[in-house]
Amino acid sequence: MPSILDKVLRMGEGRILKKLTGIVAQVNAHEDTVREFTDAELREETDVFKARLADGETLEAILPEAFATVREAARRTLGQRPHDVQVMGGAALHLGNIAEMKTGEGKTLAATLPAYLNALSGDGVHVVTVNDYLAQYQSDLMGRVYRFLGLTTGCILSGQKPEERRRHYAADITYGTNNELGFDYLRDNMAWSSGELVQRGHNFVIVDEVDSILIDEARTPLIISGPASGDANKWYAEFARVARRLTRESDYEVDEKKRNVGVLEPGIEKVEDYLGIDNLYESLNTPLIGFLNNAIKAKELFKRDKDYVVLKGEVLIVDEHTGRILAGRRYNEGMHQAIEAKEGVAIKAENQTLATITLQNYFRLYGKLAGMTGTAMTEAAEFQGTYKVGVVPIPTNMPMARLDKPDLVFKNEDGKFDAVVEDIVERHAAGQPVLVGTTSVEKSELLSTKLKRQGVPHEVLNAKQHAREASIVAMAGRKGAVTVATNMAGRGTDIMLGGNAEHLAIATLAEQGLDPNETPEEYEAAWPDALEEATTSVAAEHDEVVDLGGLYVLGTERHESRRIDNQLRGRSGRQGDPGESRFYLSMGDDLMRLFNSGLAERFMGSSAYPDDMPLESKLVTRGIASAQGQVEARNFEIRKNVLKYDDVLSRQRAVIYTDRRRVLEGEDLAEQVQGFLTDVVTAYIESATQAGAPESWDLDELWTALKAVYPISITPEEVVSEAGNATRVTPEMLTREILSDAEHAYARREEELTPDVMRQLERRVVLAVLDRKWREHLYEMDYLKEGIGLRAMAQRDPLVEYQREGFQLFSAMRDAIKEEAVGYLFNLEVKRPEPAESAEESTDGAPVVPAVPTGSDGEPLAPEQEAVPAGEPERPAKRRPAARVATRPAAEVDPLGLDTPERPAALQYSAPSSDGGSSFSEGRVVRSEGGTSGGSARPAAGASSGGGGGGANREARRRAAKAAKKRR
């Protein structure tokens, strides 16, 4: 079926390529004209294009001239003129497609064409890369083109302060990684004031290495979490000791394909004896089962120096797709703590989800999505089905000259690595540069040790040496160079024969203290000479390496995905250069061991078969392709499943985040809050009058419940008297009388606080209640999803059940937000500010508002003041002056007898899993940013009560309200 769908999707290739060829002809027609422009005239074209767009012209109408302008700017600033195939790629990106451009074809430069064109609208363009290094590098290099044309660039990096991020997002073109952009979106929807927002919308995005980001990394959602309550850390160390006492096969089973474990009866008995309990599966002991399973998984499924490394007493995850350390990210659901216990390092606390989104749904937020990669056609069906974007294969500028040799399979790993070392020694002696790809830090260091014994000088590029990545990659194509690398060298790196002139020029200018952002004029002036010097130094060596056969890529193990193998191969043979590639495999490799059918083992299983004799046959090649196909099919199902379930939460998230943004941006909530009050009161009345005759209604109980919502001033007797007698009381009459009283109570509350303070109090209360209820809802949805699979045993579709019950939970949450927000508005105690102090503290006309309000559970109820970067003037508010928290508390809120805990200063950021699974994800502890920790508010002496009555009376009303809700 997929092959048929692929054929259908490829039927339109000829048509789109014909259209792109026509666009190239139009761009070329303008080239001579723009080449005659002076630098100033070329810069003025940007203003001309913006004016034409303002007059109603479309982006498509100005595309040929805009592309020609960028092409000329790139020629003048970088010394590089985009080829026709790069213009085709840029046009494909602008049209909202994925451009498949082979390695070395200049994807980064091609992206400048649509980025410039779409930035002219003023709505911003995001360019997404796979890591911080590439984001910074591309921003610095391509930013020279944009700045030449009068546009601004930004770069989002981990560790930046909120004000830095806001400034970079405000630029015309912003570079960053998928995780950083996704987390900023989630953080914006956790902000407590409009001043904390950093992003400005999602207009157009270009995703570099799009298959890695939207396919490989899409199996696990982005999650922001905070410390959970309780201390379960003691059990992790205890169960790490238990796991060491258990034996594989006899005490437990391991399914490495599905990455699951199962404890057998003998193992259960050992655990019960060790813990001194009678039954591990009693309800009281049920939580211990999770600790046991995680301890066994940590022991069997997570390998040190492959899945993670231990540096400075900390467990750091290694990304299987890139080989890079995922700085500070952590596995969720207790998995990271189990690994920490296994390694004997400090165990950090567990976390609770605060915000989450999948990469699929994040990138669906953009008005237009485009991407580029060297390997996309194999996933064309998934790109079309999930993201509604097509894949366009762009022709190469020069014919491919790389020779891909057949795989060699050895009996065991020792024989394989001996042959690998022998091959490297031979190539190195001839002077041919060699790039060796490994699948883990452990294997790269093993091979490095063997090469040292042979006296072969080499560089190692893995997660432990990631800081030297740029310099290592820049030199990997030089004569005699030997580079041993994990997947880090597979994407986003351009290995040029003889050396990378651009990298050398950048390094030279950096040594001179020149920076493209800090000293742009000096940098531009020095660039031509630096580039010319670097180009001259590598030109002669380039020709020499070409004569030696180009770069030799040697893979030591097949990856789960064919695309990752192709990415490694693609480092060689760029722009028509010669090259060579070959994979060395063994029957002990993970892919062969887990998915091989056993045919190759029967050939090589004989004890007489030499360890150093390779097997080369079509049968093995087909077996490898079959194994990779199984893994890719499994991962595709995981991604589809993740998306189906997240689509349920995505619709709910869109509603909540839209409501939240309106509150943050200063919308007048008076009408909405009065609507809340009407809905809550009506629901209480309907619950009390839905059964029985009027004389049997318990009006006293209804009144007790209503007093927990607002200070009701009429009595049941007055309502009965108004009707004549109890039998003549109707639900409509009750609703009319009580709603009228509630409206008067709202007006009295507003008059007491003043309209300005009332509006700000409404904003803070609604925002805080919404946040807390949304967090609780995420927890409930997680809990629901964990057990929903069991519904299949009752012949019910788990997804349908999840959708149905998820909607019920969402509806209940919306009702709870209304009820709790109204209750807080009437019952919070507010200290009135002294007029003199108010005038002193608030000089910009902004109302002075209460400090952080809190609820009965101690949760913060309000955002902090708007963050203004140091040294900058305060930004004017859009609709009316923004409320500020006074330096000396002008108003405080009664926390109903409980202390207010500080808002967590350290959050966890969970991103795509390093092992590609969907049952857990990683998180990251980050610095405490400005505006993230809440203060403690205590009741002040002399505070006036907004809701009447003391704390004890309020508590009684709340208990009565809860009882009424249960009956409802």
UniProtKB/Swiss-Prot annotation:
GO molecular function (one): protein-exporting ATPase activity
Transmembrane segments: none
Catalytic activity: ATP + H2O + cellular proteinSide 1 = ADP + phosphate + cellular proteinSide 2
GO cellular component term of the entry, any: plasma membrane
Residue sites binding ATP per the record: Q86, G104, E105, G106, K107, T108, D494
Keywords for the protein's UniProt record, in alphabetical order: ATP-binding, Cell membrane, Cytoplasm, Membrane, Nucleotide-binding, Protein transport, Translocase, Translocation, Transport
UniProt topology in membrane: Peripheral membrane protein
Pfam families given in the database record: P-loop_SecA (PF21090), SecA_DEAD (PF07517), SecA_PP_bind (PF01043), SecA_SW (PF07516)
Signal peptide as annotated in the record: none
Functional description taken from the UniProt entry: Part of the Sec protein translocase complex. Interacts with the SecYEG preprotein conducting channel. Has a central role in coupling the hydrolysis of ATP to the transfer of proteins into and across the cell membrane, serving as an ATP-driven molecular motor driving the stepwise translocation of polypeptide chains across the membrane.
PANTHER family, per database record: CHLOROPLAST PROTEIN-TRANSPORTING ATPASE (PTHR30612:SF0), SECA INNER MEMBRANE COMPONENT OF SEC PROTEIN SECRETION SYSTEM (PTHR30612)
Name of the protein this chain belongs to: Protein translocase subunit SecA
Organism for this UniProt entry: Beutenbergia cavernae (strain ATCC BAA-8 / DSM 12333 / CCUG 43141 / JCM 11478 / NBRC 16432 / NCIMB 13614 / HKI 0122)
Recorded name of the encoding gene: secA
